[in-house]
């Protein structure tokens, strides 16, 4: 039978079984190695409100940083595709195993 992907859509290589996790979006049971995982760091206070709060004088201490939320989201393949976290690639593009470039993230340059 033909195979669609070299790793069969999983990163289990050599393990007999892996634990299941629940999708963040739909609560479907998904093998942990197959789930699409994303780690989000978001500020609790949005940027528009930071200036207003700082102007009030409550948190105008030099170097004060507002707290941020740290959330690890795990999605099943269906929800990841539906919410555009991952995209369907053509047959030729599926063979490319390098990680796609992330927009807005600069590569570290070598120090001279």
From Swiss-Prot:
GO terms for cellular component: cytosolic small ribosomal subunit; extracellular matrix. Pfam families: Ribosomal_S26e. Coiled coil: none annotated. Transmembrane segments: none annotated. Residues 93-112 are annotated as: Disordered. GO terms for molecular function: mRNA binding; structural constituent of ribosome. It comes from the Eukaryota. One of its GO terms (biological process) is translation. The keyword Ribonucleoprotein applies. This is Small ribosomal subunit protein eS26. The gene is rps26.
């Amino acid at each position: 039978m033909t195979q669609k992907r070299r790793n069969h859509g999983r990163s289990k290589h050599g393990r007999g079984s892996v634990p299941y996790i629940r999708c963040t979006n739909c609560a479907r049971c998904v093998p942990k190695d197959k789930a699409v995982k994303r780690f989000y760091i978001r500020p609790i206070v949005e940027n528009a409100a930071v200036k207003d709060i700082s102007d009030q004088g409550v948190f105008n201490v030099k170097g004060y940083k507002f707290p941020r939320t740290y959330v690890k989201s795990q999605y099943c393949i269906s929800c990841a595709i539906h919410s555009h976290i991952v995209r369907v690639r053509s047959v030729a593009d599926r063979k490319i195993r390098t990680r796609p470039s992330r927009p807005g993230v600069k590569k570290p340059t070598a120090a001279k």
